[in-house]
């Protein structure tokens, strides 16, 4: 299951018009990378919960055939939170354990090892965790010597903590401990409640991974994910243009029209069908989505341009996200 019902309030006003899981990173929506990850491990039956802009998600993803997956939808009349959303959708998998991933995640994760690790324990939940950096602002999670989660706290201890990367395996027995109706949070109403009960220290296991992870819950994190893509630090930049981009720091998609005296400052990515007016300077750190139009005599630096967007003649933009609905200053 991929959690896609949230409102994404920290990314407003972008999320007023477009659901977070469909935000482009590089040349694809975030959720497309999650589909790819799941398919690597033979997982093609996927449930999405829907609430905020759910019709747009359904309209853009359909039955999933474009991504070689099969999507089922669990619409929520009221926003049920992470726990309530999984609880309601559990009719799709019955008494089986379920892998649940946040829909705003970009991650490298060995799902096979995660599942085997979970199955080898008697845990109700197994959380995928990554060692925290010294200046991380994520809520620290602490483990004992047996990799049991012992604390999910808002303050750091002297011992190293871990960040939860938004992927977990959950048992049906755990879901039955959540409130039976209404909104519920997996962490607040589930994991922390289990920890407070102190019945069994092995009820929540931590699976440690060191692979790539970004989530796009804020403007800064969304920009960082796209900078990783442009800078070659992301494992998701390996599609059809990897060799060319690695060599030149420049990708020009199919059917692009580039005006005379255009100046490129790498790294620059132009999606298919883009149009660039004469005398424009592109870059550095510029990502232009497919079918976008940039007028003459523009200067663009550290800009993310969504597909089907338009930049007026003579525009000079820096640290901005441009969408078909408008532009947002992020720096």
Q: Which role fits each region the language model picked out?
A:
Residues 2, 24, 28-102, 108-113, ...:
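Conserved N-terminal catalytic core of the sugar/cofactor nucleotidyltransferase
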Residues 7, 104-105, 262:
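Active-site metal-binding loops of divalent metal-dependent hydrolases
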Residues 244-331:
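Structural signal for interior beta-strand "rungs" in well-ordered beta-sheet cores
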Residues 121-131:
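A short, conserved acidic/glycine-rich loop-to-beta-strand motif
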Residues 22, 141-143, 191, 206:
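A structural signal for short hydrophobic beta-strand segments in well-ordered beta-sheet cores
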Residues 47-51, 128-129, 304, 321:
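Short internal beta-strands
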Residues 43, 97-99, 106, 112-119, ...:
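Catalytic-core segments of class I nucleotidyltransferases/pyrophosphorylases
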Residues 1-16, 41:
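N-terminal nucleotide-binding beta1-loop-alpha1 segment
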């Amino acid at each position: 299951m991929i959690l896609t019902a949230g409102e994404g309030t920290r990314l407003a006003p972008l999320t007023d018009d477009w659901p977070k899981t469909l935000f482009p990173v590089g040349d694809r929506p975030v959720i497309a990378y999650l589909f790819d990850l799941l398919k690597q491990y033979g997982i093609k039956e996927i449930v999405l919960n829907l609430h905020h802009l759910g019709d747009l998600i359904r309209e853009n993803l359909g039955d999933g055939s474009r991504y070689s997956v099969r999507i089922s939808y669990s619409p929520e009349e009221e926003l049920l939170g992470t726990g309530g959303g999984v609880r309601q959708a559990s009719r799709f998998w019955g008494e089986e354990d379920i892998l649940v991933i946040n829909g705003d995640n970009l991650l490298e994760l060995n799902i096979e090892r995660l599942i085997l690790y979970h199955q080898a324990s008697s845990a109700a939940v197994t959380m995928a965790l990554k060692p925290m950096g010294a200046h991380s602002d994520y809520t620290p999670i602490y483990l004992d010597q047996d990799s049991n989660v012992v604390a999910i706290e808002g303050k750091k201890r002297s011992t190293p903590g871990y960040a939860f990367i938004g992927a977990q395996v959950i048992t049906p027995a755990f879901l039955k401990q959540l409130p039976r109706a209404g909104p519920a949070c997996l962490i607040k109403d589930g994991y922390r409640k289990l920890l407070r009960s102190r019945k069994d220290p092995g009820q929540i296991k931590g699976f440690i991974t060191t692979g790539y992870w970004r989530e796009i819950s804020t403007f800064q994190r969304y920009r960082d994910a796209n900078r990783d893509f442009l800078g070659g630090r992301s494992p998701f930049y390996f599609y059809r243009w990897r060799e060319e981009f690695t060599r030149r720091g420049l990708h020009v998609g199919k059917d692009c029209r580039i005006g005379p005296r255009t100046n490129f400052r790498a790294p620059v990515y132009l999606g298919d069908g883009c149009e660039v007016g004469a005398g424009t300077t592109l870059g550095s750190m510029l990502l232009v989505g497919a079918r976008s139009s940039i007028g003459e005599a523009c200067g663009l630096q550290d800009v993310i341009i969504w597909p089907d967007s338009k930049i007026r003649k003579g525009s000079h933009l820096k640290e901005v996200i441009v969408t078909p609905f408008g532009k947002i200053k992020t720096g």
